[in-house]
Design a protein with these regions (language model features):
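Outer-membrane beta-barrel pore domains
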Residues: 51-61, 66-209
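Surface-exposed coil loops of outer-membrane beta-barrel proteins
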Residues: 1-42, 68-83
Length: 209
């Protein structure tokens, strides 16, 4: 991985660029020689002695192995089957991300606000929007065919320290839409090849750490 920063005396010292080419995901062994690109341009700066802000833009570009001779892509509000002609083709996986955070000190303790959003394309399978994590090459079976979905996800965090105590209250709201091309009654429509896997979901969480 390559990291670029200016000298601390530079007016641009609050910027940082990280980028690299990676093989595999460090979970299962790599099954091909393709590399994925991951990059992030971030900024972080203090506001006096009472606060700090940060923001970033990230980009991911990679590929997912398709073990079958078929694949599915969205056309309008339904999937269309494609004949790939052979096994061992690849589908593009691409993410664009934005993140930001702001923290400040007050009589209540430290308050941190954080938000992050991702959009892109995610090849999954019929019953799961997450990309397959193969440790070995799977068989040429229909259930292993890739489904390419345009997705959107974002979350908001509020973390409030409780005075000088070691405890914090946390409020979180997150949304994940695995397929932005369909919604409501369109999901599961006849001959659309969509299913509950394509349903959007959102959650609100309250807790402490």
């Amino acid at each position: 991985m390559l990291t670029l920063r200016t000298k601390t005396t530079s007016p641009l010292s609050f910027l940082r660029l990280d980028a690299g080419l990676f093989a595999g995901n460090s979970i299962n062994r790599e099954t091909d020689s393709r590399k994925d690109f991951i990059g992030r341009l971030g900024a972080e700066k203090a506001i006096g002695d009472w606060g700090k802000w940060g923001a970033g833009f990230s980009y991911y570009h990679g590929f997912v192995y398709n073990p079958t001779t078929e694949a599915y892509e969205m056309r309008g509000n339904h999937f269309v089957k494609r004949d790939m002609g052979e096994t061992g083709t690849y589908m593009k996986r691409q993410y664009l991300g934005l993140d930001g955070q702001f923290s400040f000190l007050s009589s209540l303790g430290k308050t941190t606000l954080r938000a992050e959003g991702l959009i892109g394309t995610q090849p999954g399978i019929a019953g799961r929007s997450k990309s397959p994590n193969y440790s070995t090459r799977p068989e040429n079976l229909p259930e292993n065919s890739l489904f390419k979905r345009p997705f959107l996800g974002y979350f908001f965090y509020l973390v409030q320290d409780i005075g000088a105590s070691p405890f914090s209250a946390v409020l979180k709201y997150d949304v994940y839409d695995p397929n932005t091309k369909v919604s409501g009654n369109e999901v599961g429509a006849e001959n659309s090849f969509t299913s509950k896997t394509d349903l959007a979901q959102s959650t609100i969480g309250i807790g402490g750490i």
